[in-house]
Amino acid sequence: MFDEDADEIKELVLIFFPFDNSVQIINTKEGKNLLKRVQFPPLKREMLQIGNIVNIFSKLLYIRDCAPATRKLLYHNVQSTFALIKPVPPSAHGKIITFIMKKGFRIVRMKNGKIDKDFAMELYQNVAGSNLLPIIINYITTGEVIGLELVAPDAVKKWRDCLGSTDPATAAPGTLRRLYGEDKLRNVAHGCVTVEEATAMLDMFFGYEKGIPRIPFRATFKNCACCILKPHVIIDGNVGAILEQIATSEKFYISAIAMFSVKLSNAQEFFEVYKEVLPEYEAMCIHLAEGKCIALEVKCNDLSLNCVCEFRKLCGPRDPDLCRQLYPDSIRAHYGKDIIHNAVHCTDLPEDGELEVEYFFKLLAND
């Protein structure tokens, strides 16, 4: 935790008691409680991940490590795997993301992109020499894909089990390919066979070379609005539902998507226009820095429309309670909790659409 008064970073011990959702914070250096044990309902077990930032009574705590017993309990056999959503209709993306999250996977990295032949050859090296390989390569490289890093116990095997067999017709009921696949080629998604393969593919898809992403971000920074899915949306499991609502609307499509971790200083800079306008400015910044968020570049299908103004209507007013009364079909009416945890941020001013998208997909993407 950064102590502004002392101008230093303090190392603390956070103890979480899941049976009554209480917390205790100890300053081990000074040998005293910074916070005596008290119930704190906003903190969820799912938020206690190494690398996350949690907000305890307006104090931002960065989780750097955990005790051996905690690691054994929470992270036993936990793995990362690489998942690739193949070129499917955008209207299906939300359903697929919802399926993934309901199966108990945590999404820790995510972005859309287009892959080249070299990446595709590496991805399908297990079918090298097959007559079908050129067809597979052509299919996977001509459309847009979404790459995901999924975390769960025994994630590599679990993801392949969730996918089902290659042919959707013979895949087990309830598997992803049985639900949404068309044939052996258009079978929704790809999974790695080994941990080593998953690690290599994650590096290829999300890695950087000389400061440039190997798979470029898809943002165009033209005629667009910015939409940020706030951290609580990810914790609540509503990412897929919001993506589906946007993609199935008649007016909009998502041209770029990526997951980010936002520092408090960046959140303050991004929301600076609201500093002297909204009394909840500080709380907005803290929430955006609490955990991972998902940034979208949203565009209108009809170029004659003002994308920012039209998309703001889909999101609804900032207060979810007001949305539920006046705009019950809006995103914030469905998934917002209060004026801070109101599901999404959307660009307010028409001239700020490109600037806000640039902040995430240029500045933060290369930070």
Predicted features along the sequence, with ranges:
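Non-catalytic terminal and connector segments of soluble metabolic enzymes
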Residues: D3, D20-N21, I53, K59-L60, ...
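Extended amphipathic alpha-helical elements
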Residues: M1-Y75
